[in-house]
């Protein structure tokens, strides 16, 4: 995936990340970068793949005794928790399962290759040969072919959005708030810095 330069702190009003978060080696750190880049009241929107993605392919790999077909993907509830831990407010999470169909195993495998790579630590350590690919294609036809003759594969897409909340006022045993700040708070304005 293309890596963009990190914008200066508090310089972005809205950040939209489509299908990037699940490929991050450290998603919590990436969320922290996004939080830092957003202005107060900035809006984050993202989509990523969820754990039910390609579940049929994972089942086939397991039946054949092969290592996992892909790395573990994060559940939407865990993404919501990470948003809160990073300092985002009012996270809203949703998901949908989309079934894509393919005419041939070759087309299915080509599209999967375009989507990314397998980060699972137990993945195949080296290239596989033609016999392996033929066996995989045969298993795809046997297990994924529907009544219409097409191969079906499920993708779970997670959607999330959240706001960067104003910094919380630190409260200690002794706190001082000016009269001007109290008036501003009562009128729905931000306190003076």
Question: What kind of region is each of these model predictions?
Answer:
Residues 17-20:
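A short beta-strand submotif of the Rossmann-like class I SAM-dependent methyltransferase core
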Residues 28-43:
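A short glycine-rich, Lys/Arg-flanked "PGG" loop and its adjoining helix->strand segment in the class I
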Residues 7, 22-24:
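A short His-aromatic
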Residues 9, 34-37, 67:
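Catalytic cores of nucleotide-enabled group-transfer and carboxylate-activating enzymes in metabolic
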Residues 45-107, 114-128:
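Conserved catalytic/acceptor-binding region of the Class I
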Residues 96-193:
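Conserved Class I S-adenosyl-L-methionine
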Residues 4-15:
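A short acidic, Gly/Pro-enriched loop at the edge of an enzyme's catalytic core
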Residues 10, 86, 153:
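Structured loop/turn residues at beta-strand edges in well-structured enzyme cores
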